[in-house]
C-alpha cells in the first residue's frame, strides 16, 4: 500500500484555450500521478457542476482558481495520509467533503482531477500501466472508435444542425488498422470537400466544419470519401451520428434550422428512421432531447432493435438516471464521460450497471480536451468495446489514438478488436 503524501492542483488550458484543472498526487517513494479534466460544449442539464470562478477580469469568467484552491486546501488536507489503492474510499471522502448531490461546492472538475490522479499514482506504484491496474481480470478488448470527421452543432461555427458525423471502422482487424482506415478517410474527405469548393477548417473535435446544404449532405460527402479511400461503406466502415438533439429542441419541437424544418417527435423519429434505412448507420446518440422521454420511448420502439441508441445528455453517466432509463426501456446504450459524474468510482459503477442490463457503454472524450489519455486506458480496462475521441486531427484527439496503439502493441495477441460485434445490433 502507498500513502498519499502530497496533492497539488493547478490551472491549465484545454484544447479550446479555456482554463481547466490538473492535479498531481504524490505517494511515498516519490511516485507522482497526474490527471487533467476535460470540459464540454453541449452539456446535459443534470451533469455534475464544473466550478468556474465567474471573475470577468480573468479568462472571461472561465477561470478555475476556486476549484484549484479546493484541491490545494480541503481536499489535500482530507486525503494526505490515505492509501492510494483505496480508490472507492478516497472518492467517497471527497463526496462527503463536498456534501452536495451535484458536487457544486468543491466542483466536479476539482474532485475528478484528484480522483483520476490517485488512480494513476496507484498504478505507477504497482508498476502497472493504468489499463491493467483498472482491469478486473486479464481479458483486454480494444475499443472500436467512432471518429467524428464532420463537426456541426455546438462543436463548430457552421450551419450544420447535427453535432457529429462519425465513421466506424467495423471491418478493421485491429486498432492499428482502424486508425489507418480513419486517417485515410479523413484525408479523402478533405479532398472531397475541397473539390466541392467547401471549407476544410476543423471544429473542436478535429473534424471538418464546412457549411453544407443539409445534414444529409454531410453523410453523403463522408460516403464518397469512404469509397474514394478504397473502402466499402457498411462492410469496412459504417456510420454513427450524434444528433445532440437537446441543442435544437425548442418548445417541444425539433428545429432543423439549416433545412428550414420544425418537426414534432414523431416526425423527427421518422427522419432518423429514414436515414437508418437509407445509409449504413449503426449508432445514433442523443436522438431525442434529454427531457423528451416520450420521444425517447418512441425512438427506442422504432429503432431500438435495429441500431445502437446512445444516451449522453439523457443519462449523463449517472447511475440513478440510467437505472430509470433501463426500467423504462429507454435507449440501449450509455455514453460514458468521466466529468459528467466526477469520480472514477462512479464512472466504473455506471459502466457496470450498463453492462449488467445488456446496454453497451461508449467511453467518450469532451469537446474541450487535454493531452490526458485516461479514457483510452479506461476503454480497454472495462472492455467497453467502443470509444469516441474525435477525428484524426488535433493532438488532443490523436493523443488518445496513439495511446490505444501503444496498448495494443504491448498486449500483442491478447488484444482483441471486436469490430461490428461491439455494437448492440451489428
Curated annotation (Swiss-Prot):
Pathway: Carbohydrate degradation; glycolysis; pyruvate from D-glyceraldehyde 3-phosphate: step 4/5
Places the protein is found: Cytoplasm; Secreted; Cell surface
Protein purpose: Catalyzes the reversible conversion of 2-phosphoglycerate (2-PG) into phosphoenolpyruvate (PEP). It is essential for the degradation of carbohydrates via glycolysis.
GO biological process, one term: glycolytic process
Keywords per UniProt: Cytoplasm, Glycolysis, Lyase, Magnesium, Metal-binding, Secreted
GO-annotated molecular function: magnesium ion binding; phosphopyruvate hydratase activity
Recorded catalytic activity of this chain's protein: (2R)-2-phosphoglycerate = phosphoenolpyruvate + H2O
Quaternary structure, from the entry: Component of the RNA degradosome, a multiprotein complex involved in RNA processing and mRNA degradation.
Cofactor names: Mg(2+)
Cofactor-binding details, from the entry: Binds a second Mg(2+) ion via substrate during catalysis.
Enzyme active site: 205, 337
Keyword match Magnesium: yes
Protein name: Enolase
Gene Ontology cellular-component terms listed: cell surface; extracellular region; phosphopyruvate hydratase complex
Binding residues annotated for (2R)-2-phosphoglycerate, in chain numbering: 163, 337, 366-367, 388
High-level lineage: Bacteria, Pseudomonadati, Pseudomonadota, Gammaproteobacteria, Chromatiales
Name of a matching Pfam family: Enolase_C
Signal peptide from the UniProt entry: none
EC number: 4.2.1.11
Similarity annotation: Belongs to the enolase family.
Amino acid at each position: 500500500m502507498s500513502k498519499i503524501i502530497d496533492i497539488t492542483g493547478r490551472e491549465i488550458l484545454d484544447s479550446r484555450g479555456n482554463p481547466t484543472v490538473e492535479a498531481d498526487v504524490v505517494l511515498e517513494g516519490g511516485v507522482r500521478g497526474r490527471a487533467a479534466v476535460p470540459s464540454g460544449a453541449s452539456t446535459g442539464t443534470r451533469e455534475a457542476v464544473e466550478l468556474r470562478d465567474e471573475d470577468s477580469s480573468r479568462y472571461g469568467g472561465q477561470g478555475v482558481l476556486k476549484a484549484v484552491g479546493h484541491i490545494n486546501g480541503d481536499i489535500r488536507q482530507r486525503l494526505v495520509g490515505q492509501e492510494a489503492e483505496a480508490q472507492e474510499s478516497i472518492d467517497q471522502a471527497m463526496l462527503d467533503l463536498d456534501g452536495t448531490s451535484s458536487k457544486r461546492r468543491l466542483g466536479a472538475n476539482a474532485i475528478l482531477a484528484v480522483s483520476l490522479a490517485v488512480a494513476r499514482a496507484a498504478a505507477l506504484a504497482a508498476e502497472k500501466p493504468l489499463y491493467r491496474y483498472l482491469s478486473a481480470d486479464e481479458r483486454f478488448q480494444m475499443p472500436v472508435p467512432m471518429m467524428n470527421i464532420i463537426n456541426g452543432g455546438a462543436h463548430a461555427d457552421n450551419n450544420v444542425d447535427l453535432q457529429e458525423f462519425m465513421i466506424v471502422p467495423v471491418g478493421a482487424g485491429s486498432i492499428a488498422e482502424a486508425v489507418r482506415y480513419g486517417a485515410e478517410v479523413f484525408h479523402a474527405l478533405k479532398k472531397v470537400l475541397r473539390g466541392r469548393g467547401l471549407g476544410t477548417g476543423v471544429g473542436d473535435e478535429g473534424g471538418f466544419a464546412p457549411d453544407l446544404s443539409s445534414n444529409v449532405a454531410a453523410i453523403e460527402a463522408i460516403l464518397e470519401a469512404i469509397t474514394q479511400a478504397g473502402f466499402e461503406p457498411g462492410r469496412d466502415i459504417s456510420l454513427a451520428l450524434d444528433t445532440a438533439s437537446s441543442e435544437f429542441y425548442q418548445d417541444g419541437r425539433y428545429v432543423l434550422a439549416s433545412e428550414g424544418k420544425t418537426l414534432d417527435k414523431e416526425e423527427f423519429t421518422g427522419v432518423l428512421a429514414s436515414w437508418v434505412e437509407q445509409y449504413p448507420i449503426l449508432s445514433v446518440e442523443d436522438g431525442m432531447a434529454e427531457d423528451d422521454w416520450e420521444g425517447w420511448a418512441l425512438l427506442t420502439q422504432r429503432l431500438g432493435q435495429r441500431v445502437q441508441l446512445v444516451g449522453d445528455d439523457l443519462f449523463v453517466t449517472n447511475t440513478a438516471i440510467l437505472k430509470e432509463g433501463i426500467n423504462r426501456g429507454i435507449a440501449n446504450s450509455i455514453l460514458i464521460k468521466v466529468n459528467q459524474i466526477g469520480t472514477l468510482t462512479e464512472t466504473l459503477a455506471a459502466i457496470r450497471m450498463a453492462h449488467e442490463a445488456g446496454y453497451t457503454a461508449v467511453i467518450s472524450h469532451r469537446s474541450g480536451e487535454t493531452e490526458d489519455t485516461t479514457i483510452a486506458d479506461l476503454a480497454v480496462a472495462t472492455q467497453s468495446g467502443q470509444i469516441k475521441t474525435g477525428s484524426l486531427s488535433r493532438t488532443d484527439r490523436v493523443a488518445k489514438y496513439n495511446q490505444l496503439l501503444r496498448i495494443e502493441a504491448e498486449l500483442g495477441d491478447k488484444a482483441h478488436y471486436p469490430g461490428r460485434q461491439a455494437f448492440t445490433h451489428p
